Regions:
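Loop/turn-rich, solvent-exposed surfaces of beta-rich toroidal or solenoidal domains
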Residues: 178-206
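Residue-level detector of Asp-centered blade-edge/turn motifs that repeat once per structural unit
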Residues: 2-5, 52-56, 95-98, 145-148, ...
C-alpha cells in the first residue's frame, strides 16, 4: 500500500515483517514484526496483507500464519501489535469509507465485514462453502471495496474476480484469469495482478476483454517484465505499484489513460 507521503508499506511475507520504504531511498525500515517467525505479539508469521488506518494512525495486518488480524500503531515507540481477531484463516483486508473492516477467509471461502472491535462479523460474499456457483468462492484472497460498498474479490481457484454489490446474495464475474491483488477506480475500471500470466490487466466497465498494461511476455526480470505479480496499489498521482513476487521487488508503472 502507498501512503500519501509516497511511502510504500510492504508485506515482506518470507521475512515475517512489514517494511516501509520511502520512494528514492536505498533501504527500508521495519515497522512491524522482524523478530523472526513466531506468535508473540512482537512477531509475525507469513503476513499476507496490510492496510493503513489513518484515523488511529495504525496498521492493520493479516498475520496469516498465526491465524489472526493485528493492529499495530505507527508511533515510533511501538514494539508489538494488538489482536483484533484470532482463529481466522485471513488473507486479504480492506476498509470502506465508514471504517468497516473486510476480511477474506480462505478456509470458509467467504468475506466478512466487521466493525472494529467486533468478533463475529457479517458475511458479505461467499459463505456457501467451496464451489463455482455465483454465490460461492474458492479460496478468496485479495479484496477491494468501492464507494458503494461493493466487494470485489480475487476468487483464486475459480480463476475469476467476483463483484458482490452491497447486500447481494450472489456475485457477478468481472474478470477471468489468475487474479491476486486488485484495485478498482472511480469509473469502475478494474486493475488486476494476473499472476499466472505475469502481467497487469486493465478491464474497463462493460468490456468483454481486458488489456495488459505491464508484463505479459512471460516471466522475466527486466524492468518491463514481471514474475508472479501479487500485490497491487495506486498512489494519489495515479501511479501503479506492483509487488513483483518472484523478482523480490516492487515495480512502479505510470498509468496511461484509456484510449
Amino acid at each position: 500500500v502507498v501512503d500519501d507521503d509516497q511511502t510504500i508499506v510492504i508485506v515482506d511475507w518470507g521475512n515475517h515483517r512489514i517494511v516501509k520504504w520511502k520512494i528514492g531511498d536505498t533501504n527500508g525500515q521495519v515497522i512491524a514484526g522482524g523478530h523472526d517467525q513466531g506468535s508473540q505479539l512482537n512477531q509475525l508469521n507469513c503476513p499476507t496483507d496490510v492496510l493503513i488506518d489513518k484515523e488511529t494512525n495504525s496498521l492493520i495486518i493479516c498475520d496469516r500464519g498465526n491465524r489472526r488480524v493485528l493492529r499495530w500503531s505507527r508511533r515510533d515507540d511501538t514494539t508489538e501489535g494488538e489482536i483484533l481477531l484470532d482463529n481466522i484463516a485471513c488473507w486479504g483486508l480492506a476498509m470502506d469509507n465508514q471504517r468497516y473492516l473486510y476480511i477474506s477467509d480462505v478456509e470458509k471461502h467467504e468475506v466478512r465485514r466487521y466493525q472494529i472491535g467486533e468478533k463475529k462479523g457479517t458475511i458479505v460474499a461467499g459463505g456457501q462453502g467451496r464451489g463455482v456457483g455465483f454465490n460461492q468462492l474458492n479460496e478468496p484472497t485479495y479484496i477491494f471495496i468501492d464507494q458503494q460498498q461493493s466487494v470485489y474479490v480475487s476468487d483464486t481457484w475459480n480463476h475469476r474476480v467476483m463483484k458482490w454489490a452491497k447486500d447481494a446474495t450472489e456475485g457477478t464475474v468481472v474478470f477471468r484469469g489468475f487474479p491476486r491483488g486488485l484495485f478498482v477506480d472511480t469509473s469502475e475500471t478494474i486493475y488486476v495482478a494476473d499472476y499466472g500470466s505475469h502481467r497487469l490487466m486493465r478491464w474497463p466497465k462493460g468490456a468483454t476483454q481486458g488489456t495488459a498494461i505491464a508484463g505479459g511476455n512471460g516471466e522475466g526480470e527486466e524492468a518491463s517484465e514481471l514474475y508472479y505479480p501479487w500485490g497491487l496499489s495506486f498512489d494519489q498521482h495515479g501511479q501503479l505499484f506492483v509487488a513483483d513476487h518472484s523478482n523480490h521487488r516492487v515495480q512502479r508503472f505510470p498509468l496511461q489513460p484509456i484510449a
